[in-house]
Regions:
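Conserved GNAT-fold acetyl-CoA-binding loop/helix
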Residues: 25-45
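Conserved active-site alpha-helix within GNAT-family acetyltransferase domains
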Residues: 112, 124, 136-154
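Conserved N-terminal entry element of GNAT/NAT acetyltransferase domains
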Residues: 1-12, 175-194
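Conserved acetyl-CoA-binding loop-helix of GNAT-fold acetyltransferases
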Residues: 101, 107-120, 143, 147
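Conserved beta-strand-loop-alpha-helix junction that forms the acyl-donor binding cleft
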Residues: 106, 132-142, 160
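Conserved beta-hairpin
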Residues: 54-70
């Protein structure tokens, strides 16, 4: 079995990330979704995510197999939600954006590893509420988040001229004790960088 792990994306990952994103854009278009069909996200989006250390890559056998952005600051488009409400509207939350699995690895369960690791990183930052949004035609993403017990909370609008409405999901984890001591030293470098 190949080594599979999550790490922060680096500038040298940008070409691999963009290949994955371009493949995802084509798949979304093929599946009838207007999501990501207006030039977003682009290379500058991911360069910014890498610069702010919010983009993560799932590595499988030394290759970038998946990418996602874990934003720990409030998402402006989540201020206004219709057809529902956030369960924890005033609590801190992390937003998971731009989730994509390489076409070379689709169907291998890597989305579970990616989400599990992102939730762990968020929890290590003291976050227990996570949000994500996706287009109503993006059935694959809906399936992934619903399998992780994200609950559909309503509709938000993003800056997309084609179709701005997105389904808004939220996961509220129980109260956990703050991590104060780590026995497995192989994780310490990652934790120290958070």
């Amino acid at each position: 079995m190949a080594e599979i792990y999550l790490r922060r994306a680096q500038t040298q990952d940008l070409a691999a990330i963009m290949k994955i994103i371009d493949d995802a854009k084509n798949l979304l278009k093929k599946n009838g979704s207007p999501q990501w069909q207006n030039g977003y996200p682009n290379r500058e989006t991911f360069a910014q995510d890498i610069a702010t250390q919010t983009n993560w890559v799932l590595i499988n056998g030394n290759k970038v197999a998946a990418t996602a952005t874990l934003q720990l600051t409030p998402e402006p488009t989540y201020r206004n939600i219709t057809q529902g409400q956030w369960q924890q509207p005033d609590e801190p939350y992390a937003t998971i954006h731009r989730v994509t699995i390489s076409s070379n690895y689709r169907g291998q369960g890597l989305s579970k590893l990616l989400f599990s690791n992102l939730l762990t990183v968020g929890q290590m930052q003291g976050i227990k509420n996570f949000r994500v949004d996706t287009h109503r035609n993006n059935k694959a993403m809906q399936h992934v988040v619903e399998n992780f017990n994200f609950k559909r909370r309503g509709i938000i609008k993003v800056n997309d001229q084609n179709d701005p409405e997105r389904l808004a999901y939220e996961l509220n984890l129980g109260i956990h004790h703050k991590l104060t001591r780590i026995n497995n030293n192989f994780m310490q470098p990652l934790i120290d960088k958070l």
